């Protein structure tokens, strides 16, 4: 099946359609389509295959702790498409206009969130990058729901914060300012709101974040609370966009969970997790 991806004289859109029909997912370094029509077609097909794979993963008798290979590969290809659109406004407009609903709305939110985070994320040295495995998606979901019950902060918002701050703890590096852990707390803030827990523990960090957001005004004034968490309107908008996507379709949580970590370095973007590096 992988020979389909090596056919030099066939368009990428045809290759993707054929591979999808045979149940294959794009390899990790599959070149992206260049034009808006092919890019839109690839995004539609990849998104469809990704969500079908997520459904199969969740419905299996014994779901694997990590995303299955097809989910991982489709999620990576989709993520690469979104990152390319976020960096090219003209291409993004032409591509997004060709997408059917509800994918069109989801893609607009995701591209906008990428741009917002690009603007506020400084480059970091590759030597400081540390990564690790995320805790199981189901376990994290139980922590978000526990925090929601206790502090009345939507689990979707907590999941979005966890994703934006550390890609669900796949990114283990401290921030330039010294923030640490899955929810990126400054040590002094953690002492005040961490409930005596471990700043690096996903469960404790999620509850601490919910405690802080509640004290800062959530759920009544969620924007103010998120701005207190990270004083950037772009950050607030990005978190709310991702939370909206998770709320619109439960599979979007597992979609984001299956994405890889890309970081900005002085030499450019670098993917630091996932297959084919």
Annotate each predicted stretch with a short phrase.
Residues 159, 177-180:
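Short glycine-rich loop/turn motifs that provide flexible caps or phosphate-binding loops at active sites
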Residues 1-149, 233, 237, 241-277:
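Cell-wall glycan-active module
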Residues 66-69, 177, 220:
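Surface-exposed, polar/charged faces of alpha-helical domains
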Residues 170-178:
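Glycine- and aromatic-rich loop/turn segments at beta-sheet edges
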